[in-house]
From Swiss-Prot:
Esterifies acyl-group from acyl-ACP to the sn-1 position of glycerol-3-phosphate, an essential step in glycerolipid biosynthesis. Involved in pollen development, by being required for tapetum differentiation and male fertility. In addition to the sporophytic effect, it also exerts a gametophytic effect on pollen performance. It catalyses: sn-glycerol 3-phosphate + an acyl-CoA = a 1-acyl-sn-glycero-3-phosphate + CoA. Signal peptide: none annotated. CDD domains: LPLAT (cd06551). This is Glycerol-3-phosphate acyltransferase 1. GO terms for molecular function: glycerol-3-phosphate 2-O-acyltransferase activity; glycerol-3-phosphate O-acyltransferase activity. Keywords: Acyltransferase, Lipid biosynthesis, Lipid metabolism, Membrane, Mitochondrion, Phospholipid biosynthesis, Phospholipid metabolism, Transferase, Transmembrane, Transmembrane helix. Pathway: Phospholipid metabolism; CDP-diacylglycerol biosynthesis; CDP-diacylglycerol from sn-glycerol 3-phosphate: step 1/3.
């Protein structure tokens, strides 16, 4: 009984492969030579006059222009997205898109349409985002296994590639860890790789927006709903199991398996008995030719035509400001970039140990020289010729910095060439041990912290970061006004840090590794600019309130750095990135 069943399964598999290949070839021909049925007669009459054609707007354009040129009669089945963008430039048409068909449906895929493609055709185009989940939500071992899969991914079909990537990435991964990655890591990379031309249409229209994708739904749904305001997301659901009260992914698709976009779209719109108003597909995907054929208006995003264009969405046009994000990787982990990172890891670790040792054991001027020789670039500029020395000799200078990384006070003290004391909060024991300057922990108690900082100022110079936490993006968080009540000898310091491989901050990871990850970068950059000492009339001694002083310094630092001021706090950051208030018990 087993042998006949195996033969039947084998026969079905062979038949499926034959049909799949034949359908794929047919779709490729349809892509290159497809034309509208009603143009067949004109095609036979005019073939000798015109051998090539350009895309046109489609049936709506034909009805408004009955006297079409011969070139229009040869148009392919679906025009390019460029044609649709030209159509949107018509003011009347734009109005009709936003009102006449209100709550009609616009649908597309995120892979290769809403997001620009970066990966080679030999690998799945979504590989970098699977790698982000594997590295940030899983472990370095999982990330290495995912990278090793590239050695055979090129031999597989797209659906099989997706199954392999999903299994390696999600098998045994905690649901909680995936939630953290989708909330705090992926949105940054998705926003940076949004396709501006497709997004223009997405943002302009008031259609109900639905995304159909074969990708795991957990990978893209949060971003599409929270950042792009998608009304619905139809993707592949992954199996979950519960072990000891914790949920894990099995890495396998649940239900009917991986989503087929065209079939899911047909099922989705079957009950409404109404075709979707607009669909956009990828010209390089044969499946998309079928996928968008059910729309009233269908357009293709042509990657080949846009390779020379800059299709990245500018930061100022993000649907929501990108202020907070987490994770260690500072680059999009394509296969080659990920391979380069793993090759660099042992070298970078040894380099970080060397840089830390130099800062701890050697004099400031020697440490600066050797750090520069090892690739650390420090830009230092001061507007205080006397380094902000107080007019009265009975207290120290209070240096007020914006907060980019844990190493802000370290680079400031080495650049000034004199010892400073730094006040910190939630600093790890390891970071305290390797710090080349004195650190004092605060208790988050206003009265006690104020008294402690006053005592430290009476003994020497002090550096404080009133934001209370780091921020990677060009924004300044709200400054705590406590520092303004301590002294009138206040010197603002503008700080910026840039990395190319690893971020030296984290909200949900191990904070003790922050300085190591930062110093593992091949060429980290630190920029410090010491501003002029705050005039007495702008301090509390001159009649200003502590809030006015804090806001003034925040504004000055933002002006120098080209950053934007916000009213956000440490609590806001940790609620977004870690789901807690950032309080250390």
């Amino acid at each position: 009984m087993v042998l006949p069943e195996l033969l039947v399964i084998l026969a079905e598999w062979v038949l499926y492969r034959l049909l799949a290949k034949s359908c794929y070839r047919a779709a490729r021909k349809l892509r290159g030579y497809g034309f509208q049925l009603k143009n067949l007669l004109s095609l036979s009459k005019t073939q000798s006059l015109h051998n090539n054609s350009q895309h046109h707007l489609h049936n709506h354009h034909q009805q408004n222009h009955p006297n079409q040129t011969l070139q229009d009669s040869l148009d392919p089945l679906f025009p390019s997205l460029t044609k649709y963008q030209e159509l949107l430039l018509d003011k009347n048409r734009a109005c009709s898109v936003s009102s006449d068909h209100y709550r009609d449906t616009f649908f597309c895929d995120i892979d290769g349409v809403l997001l620009r493609q970066h990966s080679s055709k030999h690998f799945h185009t979504f590989f970098p985002y699977f790698m982000l989940v594997a590295f940030e939500g899983g472990s370095i071992i999982r990330a290495i296994l995912l990278l090793l899969s590239c050695s055979f991914l090129w031999t597989l079909q797209q659906e099989t590639k997706l199954r392999v990537l999903s299994f390696i990435t999600f098998s045994g991964l905690r649901v909680k860890d995936m939630d953290n990655v989708s909330r705090s890591v992926l949105p940054k990379f998705f926003l940076e790789n949004l396709n501006i031309q497709v997004y223009d249409i997405w943002a302009r229209t008031e259609y109900s927006k639905v995304v159909f994708t074969s990708l795991p739904q957990v990978l893209v749904e949060r971003f599409l709903r929270e950042h792009l305001n998608a009304d619905d997301v139809i993707g592949t659901k992954l199996q979950e199991i519960k072990v000891m009260g914790r949920k894990f992914y099995t890495g396998l698709a649940s239900g009917s398996g991986f989503v087929l976009k065209h079939k899911s779209a047909e099922d989705y719109f079957f009950d409404s008995k109404k075709k979707p108003a607009l669909g956009i597909g990828s010209s390089s995907s044969p499946q998309d030719h079928i996928f968008i054929s059910i729309c009233k208006e269908a357009y293709f995003w042509n990657e080949e035509e846009s390779m020379s264009k800059n299709n990245a969405l500018p930061r100022e046009r993000y649907p929501k400001p990108l202020i907070f994000h987490d994770g260690r990787l500072a680059f999009l982990p394509t296969p080659l970039a990920t391979l380069a990172m793993f090759i660099w890891l042992p070298i970078g670790f040894l380099l970080a140990v060397f840089r830390i040792s130099v800062g701890v054991f050697l004099p400031y001027h020697v440490a600066n020289f050797l750090a520069s020789m090892s690739g650390v670039r420090i830009t230092f500029k001061t507007h205080n010729l006397n380094n902000g020395r107080p007019e009265k000799g009975n207290s120290g200078v209070l240096y007020v910095c914006n907060h980019r990384t844990l190493l802000d006070p370290v680079f400031l003290t080495t650049s000034l060439g004199k010892p400073l004391t730094a006040v910190t909060y939630s600093l790890s024991k390891f970071s305290e041990f390797i710090a080349p300057l004195k650190t004092v922990s605060l208790k988050r108690d206003r009265k006690k912290d104020g008294e402690a900082m006053q005592r430290l100022l009476s003994k020497g110079d002090l550096v404080v970061c009133p934001e209370g936490t780091t921020c990677r993006e060009p924004y300044l968080l709200r400054f705590s006004p406590l520092f303004a009540e301590l002294t009138e000898d206040i010197v603002p310091v503008a700080v910026d840090a840039r990395v190319s491989m690893f971020y030296g901050t984290t909200a949900s990871g191990l904070k003790c590794l922050d300085p190591i990850f930062f110093l593992m970068n091949p060429r980290p950059v630190y920029c410090l600019e010491i501003l002029k000492k705050l005039p007495k009339e702008m301090t509390c001694a001159g009649g200003k309130s502590s809030f006015e002083v804090a806001n003034f310094i925040q504004g000055e630092l933002a002006r120098v750095l080209g950053f934007e001021c916000t009213n956000l706090t440490r609590r806001d950051k940790y609620l977004v990135l870690a789901g807690n208030e950032g309080i250390v018990r």
